[in-house]
Amino acid sequence: MWRLFGKSAHLWPNWLYKLISNIHSKMMKFNHTYIGEIIIGDHILMLETIGNKSKQVRKTPLTYANYENSYIVAASFSGSDKTPDWYHNLSTYNPYITVDSVRFEATYELIESSEKDFFWSLLDEVYPTFQMYRKRTTRDIPLIKFSKV
C-alpha cells in the first residue's frame, strides 16, 4: 500500500497511518502474488518488536534492500521529522523478521555515517521515494542492518 500512497503519508493523521500500516501487515501474505506486488511491492519485510512501554508485540512492514546476508532498512517514517516507534523498540529485545515467509530472530546494527551513501543507493534502487523522504525531513534518518542470529 505504501507504493500507492507512501508519497503523502507524512501528511496523514497518526490514526490513519496506523490503520494503513495494519492493513499492510495483513496483506503481507500476498507478497509473492502479482496482486501483492502491485499493492505492497516486493522487498517488504515484517519487523516484530516488543513495545518499550506496552510490552506487546508490534509488527511493522518495512521496505528493505539486500546486502550480503543482511537486510537494510531506513527508519524514515515517510520522511516525518519524528523517528518511528519501532526504531526505539529495537533496544528492548532482539527483533524477529519475516522475509519471503521465513521468520527468524535477528540482530541489528546502526549504519555509520561514513557508509550511509552506499546503503542509501541500495535502498533508492528498491524504492526511489526514499529520496523524497530525505529531502522532506530535517532529521538524519537512521539506517539499520538486520542479520540472522
Outline where the language-model segments fall:
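Short beta-strand segments
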Residues: D42-S78
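Short secondary-structure transition/capping segments
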Residues: W12-K18, D124, I144-V149
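Short beta-strand micro-motifs in enzyme catalytic cores
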Residues: L45, D140-I144
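Short, structured beta-strand-loop surface elements
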Residues: F77-F130, R136-D140, K148-V149
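Short, conserved active-site entrance elements at the starts or edges of catalytic domains
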Residues: W12-G51, V57
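Compositionally biased, charge-rich terminal segments
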Residues: M1-W15
